[in-house]
Amino acid sequence: MAIDLRPFIPFGRGALSQATDPFRAAVEFTLMPMLITNPHLPDNPIVFANPAFLKLTGYEADEVMGRNCRFLQGHGTDPAHVRAIKSAIAAEKPIDIDIINYKKSGEAFWNRLHISPVHNANGRLQHFVSSQLDVTLELSRLVELEKERKTLSIETARSKDQLDYIVEVANIGFWTREFYSGKMTCSAECRRIYGFTPDEPVHFDTILDLVVLEDRMTVVQKAHQAVTGEPYSIEYRIVTRLGETRWLETRAKALTGENPLVLGIVQDVTERKKAEANKALVSREIAHRFKNSMAMVQSIANQTLRNTYDPEQANRLFSERLRALSQAHDMLLKENWAGATIQQICATALAPFNSTFANRIHMSGPHLLVSDRVTVALSLAFYELATNAVKYGALSNEKGVINITWAIMEDKGEKKFHMRWAESRGPEVMQPARRGFGQRLLHSVLAEELKAKCDVEFAASGLLIDVLAPITPEVFPGMGHNVPEQRIA
């Protein structure tokens, strides 16, 4: 039904207060700011403004009556909003719009404006009625929220980029799995780790088929436990489609609910597992070498104390022999405990004597690498034999010499290692009542380690020791078949 406002149009503020119509009184005294304009007058001027409007804008009634509403606009008003209002008025259609208006004080505010055309019973336009509502606080809060949303969006994007970078650098793949269906989504790194193509659909069974049989049941059990919502971690092996065995570590947790979703990461830890295995191997090897070293020290101590009755002499001999043992170990450390060549062993063990007898100690032979245990035994033996040579043998006079030679020779159709310690031009030697430490090393340790035959001759020309041993990979690691045969003269 059209509203007939003609009875109060000629009146300004207060005109409605004299009316008895409750509707008219409500328009004047409502707390909602309201205006009525007359489109039949030039420039569609204001013909009614209620007290709520005057209070909102700060104007007096006589300052607004007869003026077009555009006086509320200012430099901050969006021209697009103004055009939208003009179009609605021209089309005699209602409009709802938020627009920046200005109070008499110059203060800007967001005005939630509603304009409706009022027609008479014949459908002819009579007036426009508008209501205003100051929504500055609301829209300001919305603006702040939008700023916060944009800031949060930027931070979220930045965090995602950082996470993607970290995941890429750390070579971590991530995946999700629908618990009941087994369908999975996988990141690019996850697909690379498992060997899947970029577009290949992935199912939990697809991954399970790659897991080695020994680990498969454990993987299945852990996957089923995920429905509890407790996080789990597991290491297992897969065999890729290229036939490579890889160690993987998976950490996951399920988002519980009607349709649980398992979220997880996977990382290739093959190199770490290799390092752990190598570490364990090294630890066992260190323990083994330590045990051997202690056994050697104990043997040196027993041999020294058993055959030396003077405490000071025993202490000196024991210290010298430990020093020789230490030099042998230093040599092995430089070679990463891979053994040493006989040339290196001779040079190291006889280094203390070379400064005095350099021109009287000669060594020759092919490049032959021997094991670490043989290295230690030979080092101690050479040191002891040289010490005895200084005391009683070829190095105890001015003319004696020592020749140390080694070679590969043929013996009864088998290649063997032959080493000789030959002293000459020294004083005449006689077989002692008991064997010295050096000879005992040659007979016990070398004979045991090399499976060697050791002959000792106290010739008139000097001490002569011949060692003949089979060629075995345990004693001669990396021994090639191209070492030329050479017979020691």
From Swiss-Prot:
Enzyme class, spelled out: transferase
One example GO MF annotation? protein histidine kinase activity
Modification note: FMN binds covalently to cysteine after exposure to blue light and this bond is spontaneously broken in the dark. However, this protein presents an adduct state that is extremely and unusually stable and does not decay measurably in 2h.
Residues annotated with S-4a-FMN cysteine modification: C69
Q: Does the keyword Repressor apply?
A: no
Q: Which residues are recorded as modified (Phosphohistidine)?
A: H288
Q: Which UniProt keywords apply?
A: ATP-binding, Chromophore, Flavoprotein, FMN, Kinase, Nucleotide-binding, Phosphoprotein, Photoreceptor protein, Receptor, Repeat, Sensory transduction, Transferase, Virulence
What the protein does comes down to: Photosensitive kinase that is involved in increased bacterial virulence upon exposure to light. Once ejected from an infected animal host, sunlight acts as an environmental signal that increases the virulence of the bacterium, preparing it for infection of the next host. This photoreceptor protein is directly related to the bacterium's survival and replication within host macrophages.
EC code: 2.7.13.3
Per UniProt, residues of the PAC domain are: 93-147, 232-281
Reactions listed under catalytic activity: ATP + protein L-histidine = ADP + protein N-phospho-L-histidine
Q: What is this protein called?
A: Blue-light-activated histidine kinase
Give the species.
Brucella melitensis biotype 1 (strain ATCC 23456 / CCUG 17765 / NCTC 10094 / 16M)
